[in-house]
């Protein structure tokens, strides 16, 4: 019954809600829009069911199995249910045991944050307690120190300067980590007399991270320069509205990009898988799980639905499996599951009016995804990503070529089939970008080829303009090279935006990165200003002129110059020259970041105080010299302790005044401070701490001012990214090693290419054999290709598809001449593989992909079928191959079809015999003689005494039909002669066609 239908996700996962102390979860109906709720008078953010504790999985692609995470909080995973262990066991302490203030503070922190591993700063180390410490010790290969009195206080620790490196290693195990820092200085407490001298140091949670949200935030105090940022996957929220209806919102924390979509899928979830393959998420949050009917169930019905055995349960369970497993196949780290949310936050506290109005225009299921992501990201201080609506776009497949997941995998566009890296892929061939933001834009271009002829021509003209060896092009290339791969302007700008939410985040942004960002923006604007006359006088392509005009308009403001005047370029340029060395202390960078001649009175005041204390210390040294009658005496520094008076042991020590305080010493010397020197040194430390705070406050104000110009900086970055991509395509098009030509675009559906070459294979091996492609809509739109195994059939059809993609990206293609029409989709069924994770056999996978192709057909589709029907018996396989091919031939949509087969009998059915002229299916159009047969060329070589001939592959396409020569290929593979002879005898008396 529909009312008792089990929700998709809940069949496999149970998610327990952990309630925070003193807070009740606000319960609202999911049907109420979070954006309408935002206009209510109650501005507080209500508590909702948390996504944790949740099970986290790791997927091993080589074995297609699910492994339980090493997180000690998670129990073993059963087949149909995941029980999540309580994350912190309550340990009963003996009543006689008295807790120290630090232990009480640690217990309080652990109880307030039970869903995280806490790294707690204690002095100059970070400590992890309890069972979490055992997990971290294994992860970092450090010592685990067990407590004899209470397991809660067992711990492991590491130095504070290792925080960034160790944090990354812990996050890679798929857990959520919180960083707790000391929020006050002991010296400030002492001098300002804040509290008692023995009071506990204040500690606060300053950052929460997962692998998908960590952006090198904690490297600032690690004593190293900014490392290269690992490219993060998207954080994706999917709302499963009904069995085949989905809404999706994805955010990229590193760039601020937001993508949304709502779509209808089928039983194979091909649409969902295509989006996930493009997004490559690092974290997924699942909502909904089962459709509107589940909303009408009361709690009892929902809880008991898994026990129902009414009709359709097995089918539903199969579909539910594929929904969840679609994520488990593509997400290597965290899959977070929630049932239908019962409460939605009031987003008015997070989003501004413009953002709220924008999101109200979206469909309600998309709004729910936005609301849940805002709630989820609040803990990571990333929720204000949704305030920049300029970064929001729709995953719109109607404006670009459709490349389903199966197509991208078969053509190896982004990852190869051997080891899932980019080596040997189309993207690796095209990627000559010089900047990270340019590379990301090129990924978007490759995955979304254009279908508008005018826009493709515009891109070709821009590539042609940038292909000349002009002075302008050389300077532009050097500018992008100067920015380089290690400076991600887009990422730095969005980090500045995040920092405006929480003050503590401002201290996690590298000042050198800020300076280099401004310097590169200044260089870019100076570059276009320098060539302004050239740009305006040149007859540039519309696209290139539009991009350069945008940059010229931005260059006419003094925004970047004003910010550069506020900082100290002489110091920072010296730092930049030592960019790959740990040159100067973080504190020195803070103090010398600003140009103190332009204001900053509080910083100048503290610097003056420090200078005054230093003068007093020198005066005190003069007094000590007179006292000890040592005119050559100077301060020494030992073990990090400065301003020490060093005296040889013996009578000299005994004669010192009684108020001299011994700091350290050796067997021969002792080191002291007088009472006044100790006091002055303490005052110096105090003013240095205050100076540090004043610098942070000034920097935070500076970042807020920068963020107010986020759109301005983003405009520069986006235009530079377009130039970077165009230069990358120009580099491919101007390849010196091989001929590349600009194809002529045709309104007709035609593929006419002379001496075409496979763009990837020609770079991997020598002696590549070029082939002509001559496919015309009205004469031979269906090619049935036979020929020997390993003869190059698959490579040929892949070459056709790749050349079309390159054409519609705007890149020259490897051939001598080409005329190509515009395609709106490339649909491929290729390869023989099962999918154990989804419970599909090889043949089931094959048929589902064929079904998807038929559903997505358009009059401008290119369809590639590789050996349809080989996953089942010969008779059924042959019959299905014939029926599917006939459907594609007779369909009124009339796509171009390339069909590889070893069923040579298909040719007699499709070519020599006319189809039934009386076919009554209104979707079929019979009678067109458009099916042509081809085979991959070869030569037979017969040696005396051989039972069957050997073959030599020629790799050229020839008209006609050919056998498969499987026995010859088996011989090449090294099968024993006895086996080959037996196979030959069997084949001579058996005809499987």
Curated annotation (Swiss-Prot):
Region (Disordered): 1-50, 290-317
Pfam families (UniProt xref): MutS_I (PF01624), MutS_II (PF05188), MutS_III (PF05192), MutS_V (PF00488)
Keywords: ATP-binding, DNA damage, DNA repair, DNA-binding, Nucleotide-binding, Nucleus
Keyword DNA repair among record annotations: yes
GO molecular function: ATP binding; ATP-dependent DNA damage sensor activity; mismatched DNA binding
Biased composition (Polar residues): 1-19, 30-50
InterPro entries: DNA_mismatch_repair_MutS-lik_N (IPR007695), DNA_mismatch_repair_MutS/MSH (IPR017261), DNA_mismatch_repair_MutS_C (IPR000432), DNA_mismatch_repair_MutS_core (IPR007696), DNA_mismatch_repair_MutS_N (IPR016151), DNA_mismatch_repair_MutS_sf (IPR036187), DNA_mmatch_repair_MutS_con_dom (IPR007860), MutS (IPR045076)
SMART domains hit by this protein: MUTSac, MUTSd
Chain spans, region Mispair-binding domain: 93-212
Family classification: Belongs to the DNA mismatch repair MutS family. MSH3 subfamily.
Subunit note: Heterodimer consisting of MSH2-MSH3 (MutS beta). Forms a ternary complex with MutL alpha (MLH1-PMS1).
Name of the protein this chain belongs to: DNA mismatch repair protein MSH3
């Amino acid at each position: 019954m529909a009312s008792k239908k089990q929700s998709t996700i809940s069949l496999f996962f149970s998610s327990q809600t952990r309630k925070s102390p003193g807070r009740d979860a606000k319960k609202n109906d999911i049907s109420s829009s979070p954006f309408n709720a935002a206009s209510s008078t109650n501005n507080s953010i209500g508590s909702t069911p948390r996504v944790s504790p949740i099970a986290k999985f790791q997927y091993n692609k080589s074995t297609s199995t699910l492994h339980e995470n090493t997180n000690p909080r998670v129990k073993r995973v059963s087949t149909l249910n995941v029980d999540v262990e309580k994350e912190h066991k309550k340990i009963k302490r003996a009543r006689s045991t008295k807790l120290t203030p630090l232990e009480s503070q640690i217990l309080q922190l652990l109880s307030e944050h039970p869903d995280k591993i806490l790294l707690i700063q204690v002095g100059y180390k970070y400590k992890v307690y309890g069972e979490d410490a055992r997990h971290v010790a294994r992860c970092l290969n450090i010592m685990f120190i067990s407590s004899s009195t209470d397991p809660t206080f067992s711990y492991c620790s590491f130095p504070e300067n290792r925080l960034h490196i160790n944090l990354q290693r812990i996050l890679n195990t798929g857990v959520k980590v919180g960083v707790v820092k000391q929020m006050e200085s002991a010296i400030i407490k002492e001098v300002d007399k804040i509290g008692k001298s023995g009071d506990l140091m204040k500690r606060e949670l300053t950052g929460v991270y997962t692998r998908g949200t960590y952006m090198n935030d904690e490297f600032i105090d690690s004593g190293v320069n900014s490392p290269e940022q690992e490219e993060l996957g998207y954080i994706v929220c999917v709302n499963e509205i009904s069995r085949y209806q989905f809404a999706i919102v994805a955010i990229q924390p590193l760039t601020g990009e937001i993508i949304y979509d709502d779509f209808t899928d089928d039983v194979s979830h091909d649409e969902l898988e295509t989006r996930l393959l493009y997004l490559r998420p690092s974290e997924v949050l699942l909502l909904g799980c089962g459709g509107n009917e589940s909303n009408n169930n009361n709690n009892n019905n929902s809880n008991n639905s898994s026990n129902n055995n009414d009709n359709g349960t097995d089918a539903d369970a199969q579909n539910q499996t594929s929904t969840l497993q679609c994520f488990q196949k593509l997400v290597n780290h965290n899959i977070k599951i929630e049932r239908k949310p019962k409460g939605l936050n009031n987003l008015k506290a997070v989003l501004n009016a413009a953002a709220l109005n924008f999101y109200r225009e979206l469909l309600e299921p998309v709004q729910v995804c936005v609301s849940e992501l805002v709630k989820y990201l609040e803990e990571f201080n990333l929720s204000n990503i949704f305030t920049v609506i300029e970064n929001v776009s729709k995953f719109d497949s109607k404006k670009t070529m459709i490349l389903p997941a199966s197509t991208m995998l078969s053509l190896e566009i982004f990852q190869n089939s051997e080891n899932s890296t980019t080596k040997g892929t189309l993207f690796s061939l095209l990627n000559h970008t010089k900047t990270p933001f340019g590379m990301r834009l090129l990924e978007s271009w490759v995955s979304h080829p254009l279908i508008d002829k005018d826009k493709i021509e515009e891109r070709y003209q821009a590539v042609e303009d940038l292909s000349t060896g002009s002075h302008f092009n050389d300077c532009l290339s050097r500018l992008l090279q100067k920015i380089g791969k290690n400076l991600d302007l887009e990422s730095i700008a969005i980090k500045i935006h995040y920092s405006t939410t929480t003050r503590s985040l401002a201290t996690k942004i590298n000042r050198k990165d800020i300076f280099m960002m401004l310097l590169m923006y200044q260089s870019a604007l100076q570059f276009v200003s320098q060539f302004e006359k050239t740009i305006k006088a040149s007859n540039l392509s519309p696209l290139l002129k539009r991009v350069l005009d945008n940059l010229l308009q931005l260059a006419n403001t003094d925004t970047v110059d004003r910010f550069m005047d506020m900082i100290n370029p002489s110091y920072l340029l010296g730092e930049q020259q030592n960019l790959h060395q740990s040159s100067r202390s973080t504190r020195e960078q803070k103090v010398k970041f600003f140009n103190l001649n332009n204001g900053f009175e509080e910083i100048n005041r503290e610097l003056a105080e420090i200078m005054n204390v230093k003068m007093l210390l020198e005066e005190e040294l003069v007094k000590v010299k007179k006292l000890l009658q040592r005119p050559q005496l100077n301060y020494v520094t030992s073990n990090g302790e400065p301003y020490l008076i060093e005296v040889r042991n013996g009578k000299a020590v005994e004669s010192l005044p009684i108020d001299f305080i011994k700091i350290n010493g050796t067997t021969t010397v002792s080191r002291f401070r007088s009472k006044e020197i100790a006091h002055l040194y303490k005052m110096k430390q105090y003013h240095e701490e205050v100076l540090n705070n004043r610098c942070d406050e000034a920097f935070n104000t500076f970042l807020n001012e920068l963020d107010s110009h986020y759109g301005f900086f983003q405009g520069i970055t986006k235009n530079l990214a377009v130039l970077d991509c165009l230069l990358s395509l120009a580099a491919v098009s101007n390849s010196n090693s091989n001929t590349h030509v600009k194809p002529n675009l045709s309104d007709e559906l035609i593929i006419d290419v002379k001496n075409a070459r496979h763009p990837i294979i020609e770079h991997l091996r020598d002696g590549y054999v070029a082939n002509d492609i001559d496919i015309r809509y009205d004469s031979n739109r269906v090619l049935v290709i036979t020929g020997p195994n390993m003869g190059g059939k698959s490579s040929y059809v892949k070459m056709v598809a790749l050349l079309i993609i390159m054409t519609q990206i705007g890149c020259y293609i490897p051939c001598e001449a080409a005329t190509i029409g515009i395609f709106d989709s490339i649909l491929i069924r290729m390869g023989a593989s099962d999918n154990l994770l989804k419970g599909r056999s090889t043949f089931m996978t094959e048929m589902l992909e064929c079904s998807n192709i038929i559903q997505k057909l358009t009059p401008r589709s290119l369809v590639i079928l590789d050996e349809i029907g080989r996953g089942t018996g010969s008779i059924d396989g042959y019959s299905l191959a014939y029926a599917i091919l006939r459907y594609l031939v007779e369909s009124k949509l009339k796509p171009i079809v390339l069909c590889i087969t070893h069923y040579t009998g298909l040719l007699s059915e499709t070519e020599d015999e006319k189809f039934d002229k009386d076919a009554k299916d209104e979707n079929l159009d019979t009678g067109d003689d458009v099916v042509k047969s081809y085979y991959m060329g070869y030569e037979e070589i017969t040696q005396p005494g051989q039972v069957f001939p050997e073959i030599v592959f020629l790799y050229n396409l020839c008209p006609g039909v050919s056998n498969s020569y499987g026995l010859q290929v088996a011989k090449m593979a090294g099968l024993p002669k006895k086996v080959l002879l037996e196979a030959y005898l069997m084949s001579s008396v058996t005809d499987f066609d």
